[in-house]
UniProtKB/Swiss-Prot annotation:
Keywords: Ribonucleoprotein, Ribosomal protein. This is Large ribosomal subunit protein bL19. One of its GO terms (biological process) is translation. The lineage of its organism: Bacteria, Bacillati, Actinomycetota, Actinomycetes, Frankiales. It comes from the Bacteria. This protein is located at the 30S-50S ribosomal subunit interface and may play a role in the structure and function of the aminoacyl-tRNA binding site. The keyword Ribonucleoprotein applies. Belongs to the bacterial ribosomal protein bL19 family. The keyword Ribosomal protein applies. GO terms for cellular component: cytosolic large ribosomal subunit. One of its GO terms (molecular function) is structural constituent of ribosome.
Length: 118
């Protein structure tokens, strides 16, 4: 069992910022097309975090041209090159599945205001 724990610790990333459901993220994803590789940015609201350790995943939702798009990313995957927190959201749930039914201003998440000294 200790061998698996040490392998998990080696493959975990340390450059991932803290974020929670409700936060708006920019996820920089490596996309391989043939023999070329490029970075694609996916910006949206985190609607869930699931799992723990190396197997942890998070789901980001955005509305593109009136169509809701959700992508689930493994947190410690080499496919995710970078994660940036754009804004912090103030929500009371860990899973924000209710955002799927909301449209327009109703789907807007209140921004978390932090004290100036922090």
């Amino acid at each position: 069992m200790h061998t698996l724990d040490s392998l998990d610790a080696e493959s975990r990333r340390t450059d991932v910022p803290e974020f929670w459901p409700g936060d708006t993220l920019k996820v920089h994803v490596r996309v391989v097309e043939g023999n070329r590789q490029r970075i694609q940015v996916f910006q949206g609201v985190v609607i869930r975090r699931q799992g723990g350790g190396v197997r942890e995943t998070f789901t980001v939702r955005k509305v593109s041209f009136g169509v809701g798009v959700e992508r689930t990313f493994p947190l410690h995957s080499p496919i995710v090159s970078r994660v940036e927190v754009v804004t912090r959201g103030d929500v009371r749930r860990a899973k924000l599945y209710y955002l799927r039914q909301l449209r327009g201003k109703a789907a807007k998440i209140k921004e978390k205001r932090e004290p100036v000294g922090r």
